[in-house]
Regions:
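Active-site-proximal region of nucleotide-activated glycan assembly enzymes
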Residues: 145-232
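Donor-nucleotide binding loops and adjacent catalytic segments primarily
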Residues: 50-51, 70, 226-329
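Glycosyltransferase specificity loop/lid
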Residues: 23-136, 142-157, 161-175, 296-342, ...
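Short beta->alpha connector loops
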Residues: 66, 129-131, 228-229, 275-278, ...
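N-terminal amphipathic/basic-hydrophobic helices that include classical n-h-c signal peptides
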Residues: 1-24
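Short, basic, glycine/proline-bearing loop/turn elements
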Residues: 35, 96-102, 117, 192-199, ...
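Acidic, Mg2+-coordinating phosphoryl-transfer loop and its flanking beta/alpha structural elements
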Residues: 351-353
Length: 375
């Protein structure tokens, strides 16, 4: 029998029954956007994408740690609080070259994920660095899309991973540090992949191998928030997709000084991001204080110690694309909202990346295509 559409409902049907039939046919699908709130980027990217679905067809749910709920601004969908490890814990472990999650944490995440699935009953899950979804979404048989960066793709044709900024590598000559890191990298990638692999085995799932890149990109579909021209790949599977830079603005008003900035001197935009070493910001501002420039800086929510130089204007958050548009030079930590979003490149600004972001090569890979101008 041919199914009825809402326009073909029998005219003689009871009005209440007719309304009920229409509503059942118009039920919306539920999309759950799941952010791991360890850095601003992992919350901002799904927040930017959540505006895309047609709300007449899809019910939108956003899940993240409550500490980041304010970033939702005037989001009209449903919010579900789900805990994440502290950002400081995440960054400290990265800075020491340690796996950011242990097995117990990922197991707890899986239980939290499944509880949320039971409550929300999503038809689709879109996650950003919520590694436990590799297990929980499969257990619940829910299609899972993961937002990632192409430099974490196993198919990225990287000639050699740059040396990360770690305590040991900072003490060694760059040549020696490079040689040692190239020898140790496979072991480091295996070490970071092990906790998720252990959780997968507990639930009877196959190993992803000894490569953290597969742990970071295990999903039914992978969405790379990058441009393929910057990150060439080899034999990219059909379920891996380049979706381009994800542009996001924090839900805050611009500071009072924003519209009063003079255009007589070059503007330098400084942001060390939420995953950089914010304690370095005063030193960067001081280094720029004697130049004939106007400095605008974002602290990404952290407090700023010391006096602000006379040529500097500081706010917790700034609209990155607009700041890049106004700036002649962008000084950043190589974070994914600064470089991988290509905001400065879009507006033809020069970029200087302060090597401050911890990790096992993330910021270095992300900004390897950026020319660092002499200034």
């Amino acid at each position: 029998m041919k199914p009825l559409t809402t326009g073909e409902l029998p005219a003689t049907a009871d009005p209440q029954a007719r309304e009920g039939m229409g509503n059942s046919l118009m039920d919306r699908k539920t999309i759950l956007f799941f952010a791991e709130a360890v850095t601003l980027a992992h919350v901002a990217r799904p927040l930017a994408l959540i505006e895309a679905p047609d709300t007449s067809r899809y019910h939108r749910v956003f899940a993240c740690d409550p500490r980041c709920q304010w970033l939702l601004g005037d989001f009209a969908g449903e919010f579900c609080p789900v805990p994440s490890i502290a950002s400081d814990t995440f960054l400290n472990r990265l800075a020491q070259g340690k796996p950011v999650y242990d097995t117990a944490t990922l197991e707890a995440y899986v239980h939290d994920d499944l509880s949320l699935f039971e409550k929300v009953k999503p038809d689709l899950v879109i996650g950003d660095f919520r590694l436990s979804l590799s297990v929980s979404a499969r257990l619940a048989r829910i299609p899972y899309l993961a937002i990632s960066n192409a430099y974490w793709s196993p198919y990225y044709r990287v000639p050699a991973y740059p040396v990360p900024s770690l305590p040991l590598t900072r003490l060694l000559p760059i040549g020696l540090a490079t040689m040692l890191f190239r020898l140790a990298r496979p072991l480091a990638f295996a070490l970071h992949a092990r906790p998720l692999d252990q959780v997968r085995r507990k639930y009877g799932m196959s190993s992803l191998g000894h490569d953290v890149r597969r742990a970071y990109t295990d999903a039914d579909h992978i969405l790379y928030a990058d441009l393929p021209q910057f990150f060439p790949t080899l034999s990219l599977p059909a379920n891996h997709h380049f979706i381009g830079p994800i542009i996001w603005k924090p839900p805050v008003s611009t500071p009072l000084w924003w519209d009063a900035l003079s255009s007589e001197r070059p503007i330098v935009y400084v942001t060390l991001g939420s995953s950089g070493q914010g304690a370095l910001l005063p030193h960067v501002l001081q280094a720029l204080s004697d130049l004939e420039v106007t400095v605008i800086a974002a602290t990404a929510g952290s407090s700023l110690a010391g006096a602000i130089p006379a040529n500097a204007y500081v706010a917790q958050y700034l609209p990155g694309d607009e700041a890049s548009h106004r700036a002649s030079l962008v000084v950043c930590n190589g974070g994914s909202l600064n470089v991988s979003d290509e905001n400065p490149l879009k507006f033809s600004s020069s970029i200087f990346r302060r090597r401050s972001e911890p990790g096992i090569g993330e910021a270095e890979c992300r900004s390897s295509f950026v020319r660092k101008p002499c200034w």
